[in-house]
Amino acid sequence: MVTVFSFKKTVYLCSMRNNFEETGLITAESLLQIKAIKLDNANPFTWASGIKSPIYCDNRRTLSYPKIRTYLRQEFVKMINEEFGTVDLIAGVATGAIAIGALVAQDLGLPFVYVRSEKKSHGLENQIEGVVESGQSVVVVEDLISTGKSSLNAVQALRDAGCNVKGMVAIFTYGLSDAEENFKAASCTLHTLTNYDFLIKKALEQNHIKDSDMQSLIKWRENPKGWGQDK
């Protein structure tokens, strides 16, 4: 049985589907089970941006677990059908969402492309790999949302190619305020399978963290840039 908790809903940072709590908790539990998400309050991780964080997420590990991979694919398909309706194309953000995006597109019977962070410096100098036609409606698939900047870079590339980006779906979001602001500024709707709140709830329930860690984890999300200055 899955215990359902109440969390704040926001159109930019979580799905509005009726079963979003159940999906969020199952997904969070799965990520913890396969160590796709690591929590270490005492020895924080350093992101590429320089931000120190008590959490590190590597959703690419899900590709090595067929049952979890299948679950994510099925939930993405449900989410896209329910939230966006008919679309012409699925786009994955390179590199983390290429595989899961292609699986989702296959299940939906839709064409697939992936979007690089920037144009190649050689060959055809493509940023979008695959066939894109102006006027196509697109849903973007991403594995992880931190500030959202790299994800929205893919959205802009598709818009520049003449596509109508209906929105984005992702496996996990940290729920940072920067992400919400960036998605609002870009007029891009985001729906995720799970989020930071679900993750912390499951981590506490399954003894991945202690009650004493909670306050620090909450403070990190409130001020991720300042949180690790004394660590």
Question: How should these model regions be labeled?
Answer:
Residues 16-84:
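Active-site-facing substrate-recognition patch
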Residues 17-31, 156-231:
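PRPP-dependent phosphoribosyltransferase catalytic core
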Residues 76-88, 155-161:
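Phosphate/pyrophosphate-binding loops at sites that engage ATP/ADP/AMP, CoA/4′-phosphopantetheine
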Residues 85-94, 169:
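Short glycine-rich phosphate-binding loop at a beta-alpha junction
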